[in-house]
UniProtKB/Swiss-Prot annotation:
Biological or metabolic pathway of the protein: Amino-acid biosynthesis; S-adenosyl-L-methionine biosynthesis; S-adenosyl-L-methionine from L-methionine: step 1/1
Compartmental location: Cytoplasm
Gene Ontology CC annotation, any one: cytoplasm
Organism the protein comes from: Burkholderia cenocepacia (strain HI2424)
Name the record gives this protein: S-adenosylmethionine synthase
Length: 395
């Protein structure tokens, strides 16, 4: 890659239609796990103008009011008026869940002498990533993009900008020099709004109240391009503006394009699905590698075959930043992390109802107490095994 380049990532708010769908799917998953933590859940959601469709496969002993959970989630997000795009009180909610296929279940349920030998719920490949661009060990563009739409939601909820509505999108372009963030080049923020706010007043408020307080002062160099509601009007939003679907914001959910993605979405899936659990484990592994001081960037790929517990492959790439070889780090990963599906579930304590919180503002890089995959508790052991000094980020 060139020595001096621009890189861009985007995020969306909790009121974006695809994120509404993700949050409903994960709220349903949490409700099920509260009653039956061994449930098999693949909860998909579609939301459109005045309509929510719940479909997928669920096998559980839990007794759940799916319709009420969908309405409560829409209400929490802030859609309590049809003028905003959907109204939790009046929208239709259709439920069409099947049970998990027995052909899939037999491969996942099969147990051997080792009770950690549960097979993977599907084939596939998953990635984890970490870098030293932020204290949270996340790429800076996606980190800032999340913080912008989080602040938009905060100012909407506390009433400081009463004309804000739930739907919003952000995009941040960062200039890199010698592989490190040097300055912010462009910030795009589009926010749904009440019809009576004038565009100049909206743009000034968004720049002064949302964007500028979010940007790190040391990265503000020269003139930043601020593009606020570039189309000029964003009154129609949410599920009325676009049909929302679970799993359609997988790059927003992860690393903003700074790392590859295996293609599998997260929301609505119980942790027997390696699409979710192995991606969380990949983040955990990568973050501990960087926190241990083994590298300043780390990418992990892990792959699985359906019904087979052991990964079919584990790969580590540190992009030339490693203080020991990638082969040595890969060996350490194999020794210090159990990447079998049930091993991941045990290692990260994933049978908890913790997932609705993940469904907006990123699954990674957030210091939430439930997010066990953000811990750096393996870093000291990795550093000692590799013979290097850990960084100050070990926690």
């Amino acid at each position: 890659m060139a020595n001096d380049y621009l890189f861009t990532s985007e995020s969306v708010s909790e009121g974006h239609p695809d994120k509404v769908a993700d949050q409903i799917s994960d709220a349903i998953l949490d409700a099920i796990l509260e009653q039956d933590k061994y449930s098999r859940v693949a909860a998909e959601t579609l939301c459109n103008t005045g309509l929510v469709v719940l479909a997928g496969e669920i096998t559980t002993t839990a007794n759940i009011d799916y319709i009420q959970i969908a309405r409560d989630t829409i209400k929490r997000i802030g859609y309590d008026n049809t003028d905003y795009g959907i109204d939790y009180k009046g929208c239709a909610v259709l439920v069409a869940y099947d049970k998990q296929s027995p052909d899939i279940a037999q491969g996942v349920d099969r147990a051997h002498d080792d009770n950690l030998d549960q097979g993977a719920g599907d084939q596939g490949l998953m990635f984890g990533y970490a870098c030293d661009e932020t204290p949270e060990l996340m790429p800076l563009p996606i980190y800032l993009s999340h913080r912008l739409v989080e602040r938009q939601a905060s100012l909407r909820r506390d009433g400081r900008l009463q004309w804000l509505r739930p739907d919003a999108k952000s995009q941040v372009t960062v200039r890199y020099v010698d592989g490190k963030p040097d300055s912010i080049d462009t910030v795009v923020l589009s926010t749904q709004h009440a019809p009576d706010i004038e565009l100049p007043a909206l743009r000034e408020a968004v720049i002064e109240e949302i964007i500028k307080p979010t940007l790190p002062a040391e990265l503000i160099k020269g003139d930043i391009k601020f593009l606020v509601n570039p189309t000029g009007r964003f009154v129609i939003g949410g599920p009325q503006g676009d049909c929302g679907l679970t799993g359609r914001k997988i790059i927003v959910d992860t690393y903003g394009g700074a790392a590859p993605h295996g293609g599998g979405a997260f929301s609505g899936k119980d942790p027997s699905k390696v699409d979710r659990s192995a991606a969380y484990a990949g983040r955990y592994v990568a973050k501990n590698i960087v926190a241990a001081g083994l590298a300043s960037r780390a990418l992990i790929q892990v792959s699985y075959a359906i019904g087979v517990a052991e990964p079919t492959s584990v790969m580590v790439n540190t992009f030339g930043t490693g203080r020991v070889s990638d082969a040595v780090i890969t060996k350490l990963v194999r020794e210090h992390f159990d990447l079998r599906p049930k091993g991941i579930i045990k290692m990260l304590d994933l049978l908890r109802p913790i997932y609705e919180k993940t469904a907006a503002y990123g699954h990674f890089g957030r210091e939430e107490p439930e997010f066990s995959w953000e811990a750096t508790d393996k870093a000291l052991a990795l550093a000692e095994a590799a013979g290097v000094e850990p960084t100050a980020r070990v926690a």
